[in-house]
């Protein structure tokens, strides 16, 4: 329920307004060089206050490592890390504790469990992805250290506005690690984490939604470069199946596609098929329309993934709901501090889950020694 992975396992815990949140990572081999700073850097990318489009909730998200790392290297024992909540304002939710918020998991949690933490959504809050990022930071370090695998994410669409940058517009760009490093810098210096030339138009779109007390969603593209051929399995533990499960498990994700995705339904087979050719002593694909995965197994080409993110459900507009005590219809006005768009902050979470998935399957596929590096 709260654990992802079979060999490289990440268990997350904590609630939005609880004392702390964190993760336990089990199955990471020993001797992996890693520091608190490596993990903190990833947490900083997810932290509130990233940009003008982020929630004004003030949180340091300062990491504390409790176990599993000694003298700058993993020990092979469970790695435990936590972050203390410091900026929660639970009184913001006291007026609506009996009125489930539309678009949130409040009502479903109440109907299923009877008792739920209404403060900021409790366990269903996006803040709980702190644990995902802690685990993902370790996984990123593991797959990059052992196989130089790079994972990068960016927004390609904000609301109804399409960007002009994505993998299929220039796949050759992603052949260079230097290009990827430059792209990362560009993304991190953009408030929407969007490398497109028309990102200013996207910013105006979000600002307009904010003026209307509304919110905006978008589409994120994730590229996994350097993953070797043979990662994944043919039937139930398919690489794309595991990635889909990892991504759909993240709050706000409502759609997932690989490679050409839904566009492939419009193509002829002759357009979709990736022809092969000999490149010295190896077989390569002339194109990568399948997104780096065929038959549940990585092809060696970059894995190309896209995810649809819904608009942030917490908006300032008055909405319709019900009172769980009186069983009567009721208007609800949500206070508190919320993101007008969650897309930029979801990107490091998606990268983290991609890294955890790849690390897990690379161990089971024999590419990483489960005991020590």
UniProtKB/Swiss-Prot annotation:
InterPro entries linked: Chorismate_synth, Chorismate_synth_AroC_sf, Chorismate_synthase_CS
Enzyme Commission number: 4.2.3.5
Entry's cofactor comment: Reduced FMN (FMNH(2)).
GO cellular component, one term: cytosol
Classification via PROSITE patterns: CHORISMATE_SYNTHASE_1, CHORISMATE_SYNTHASE_2
Reaction(s) this enzyme catalyzes, per UniProt: 5-O-(1-carboxyvinyl)-3-phosphoshikimate = chorismate + phosphate
Annotated GO MF terms: chorismate synthase activity; FMN binding
Protein name: Chorismate synthase
SUPFAM superfamilies in the record: Chorismate synthase, AroC
Origin: domain of life: Archaea
CDD domains: Chorismate_synthase
Provenance organism: Methanococcus maripaludis (strain C5 / ATCC BAA-1333)
One Gene Ontology term from the biological process aspect of the record: chorismate biosynthetic process
């Amino acid at each position: 329920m709260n654990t992802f992975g079979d060999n490289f396992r990440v268990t997350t815990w904590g609630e939005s307004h609880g004392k702390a949140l964190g993760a336990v990572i089990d199955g990471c081999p020993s001797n992996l060089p890693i520091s608190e700073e490596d993990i903190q850097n990833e947490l900083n990318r997810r932290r509130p206050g990233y940009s003008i489009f982020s929630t004004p909730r003030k949180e340091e998200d300062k990491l504390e490592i409790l176990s599993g790392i000694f003298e700058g290297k993993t020990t092979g024992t469970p790695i435990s890390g936590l972050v203390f909540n410091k900026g929660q304002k639970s009184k913001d939710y006291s007026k609506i504790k009996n009125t489930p918020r539309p678009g949130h998991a409040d009502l479903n949690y109440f109907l299923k469990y009877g008792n739920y933490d209404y403060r900021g959504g409790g366990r269903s809050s996006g803040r709980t992805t702190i644990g995902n990022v802690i685990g993902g930071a370790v996984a990123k370090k593991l797959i990059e250290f052992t196989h130089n695998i790079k994972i990068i994410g960016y927004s390609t669409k904000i609301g109804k506005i399409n960007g002009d940058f994505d993998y299929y517009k220039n796949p050759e760009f992603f052949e260079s690690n230097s290009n990827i490093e430059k792209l990362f810098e560009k993304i991190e210096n953009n408030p929407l984490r969007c490398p497109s030339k028309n990102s200013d138009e996207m910013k105006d779109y979000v600002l307009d939604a904010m003026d209307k007390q509304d919110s905006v969603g978008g589409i994120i593209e994730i590229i996994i470069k350097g993953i070797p051929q043979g990662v994944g399995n043919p039937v139930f533990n398919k690489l794309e199946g595991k990635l889909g499960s990892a991504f759909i498990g993240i709050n706000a994700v409502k759609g997932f596609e690989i490679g050409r995705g839904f566009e492939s339904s419009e193509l002829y087979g002759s357009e979709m098929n990736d022809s092969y050719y000999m490149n010295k002593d190896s077989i390569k694909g002339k194109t990568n329309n399948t997104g780096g995965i065929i038959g549940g197994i990585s092809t060696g080409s970059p894995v190309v993934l896209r995810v649809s993110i819904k608009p942030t459900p917490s908006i300032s507009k008055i909405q319709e709901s019900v009172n769980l005590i009186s069983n009567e219809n009721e208007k609800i006005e949500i206070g508190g501090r919320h993101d007008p768009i969650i897309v930029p902050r979801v990107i490091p979470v998606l990268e983290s889950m991609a890294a955890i998935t790849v690390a897990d399957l690379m161990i089971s596929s024999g590419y990483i020694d489960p005991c020590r590096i």
